[in-house]
C-alpha cells in the first residue's frame, strides 16, 4: 500500500483522482492524477499528473526532510479538434496515454531548460 503525503501546495487532498505504480525494474515510479480548483466566482478545475520515485526518502536537510525530492508535476492539456477537455473521468482507463503524454512533456521541458541554461551561460 502506498501512502501519499498531500498538502494544499503540492497535491490537494480533495483533488486526488487516482494513483498507480509503474514498475520497470530500474526506477519504480508512482504516477498521481489530480485536479486543482481555482477561482471563487468562476470555478476552474485544472488537471495535473505528477511523478515521483517509489523509493523517495525525502531530502537530506531539516527543511526538506518531509518533502519529496523527486516530485515532478505538469498540467495536462487535452485539445482535440479545437475543443478543450479539462476533466479527469476514468484514471484507470487512460493510464498508458497519460504516461506517454507526461513523459513527452517532461522530455520537452527538460530540453527547453537545457537550451535556456546553454544560451544563458554561453
From Swiss-Prot:
What else the UniProt entry mentions is:
Variola virus encodes a likely non-functional truncated version of the semaphorin-like protein.
Q: Which family does it belong to?
A: Belongs to the semaphorin family.
Coiled-coil region list: none
Which source organism? Variola virus (isolate Human/India/Ind3/1967) (VARV)
SUPFAM superfamilies documented for this protein: Sema domain (SSF101912)
Domain named Sema: residues? 1-122
Q: Which InterPro entries does this entry report, sorted A to Z?
A: Semap_dom (IPR001627), Semap_dom_sf (IPR036352), WD40/YVTN_repeat-like_dom_sf (IPR015943)
- Which N-terminal residues, if any, form the signal peptide? none
Name the chain's protein.
Answer: Semaphorin-like protein A43
Amino acid at each position: 500500500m502506498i501512502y501519499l503525503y498531500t498538502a494544499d501546495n503540492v497535491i490537494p487532498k480533495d483533488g486526488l483522482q487516482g494513483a498507480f505504480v509503474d514498475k520497470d525494474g530500474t526506477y519504480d515510479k508512482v504516477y498521481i492524477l489530480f485536479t486543482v480548483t481555482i477561482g471563487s466566482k468562476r470555478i476552474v478545475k485544472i488537471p495535473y499528473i505528477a511523478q515521483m520515485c517509489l523509493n523517495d526518502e525525502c531530502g537530506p536537510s531539516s527543511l526538506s526532510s518531509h518533502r519529496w525530492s523527486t516530485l515532478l508535476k505538469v498540467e495536462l492539456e487535452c485539445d482535440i479538434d479545437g475543443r478543450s477537455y479539462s476533466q479527469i473521468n476514468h484514471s484507470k482507463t487512460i493510464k498508458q496515454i497519460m504516461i506517454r503524454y507526461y513523459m513527452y512533456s517532461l522530455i520537452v521541458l527538460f530540453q527547453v531548460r537545457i537550451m535556456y541554461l546553454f544560451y544563458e551561460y554561453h
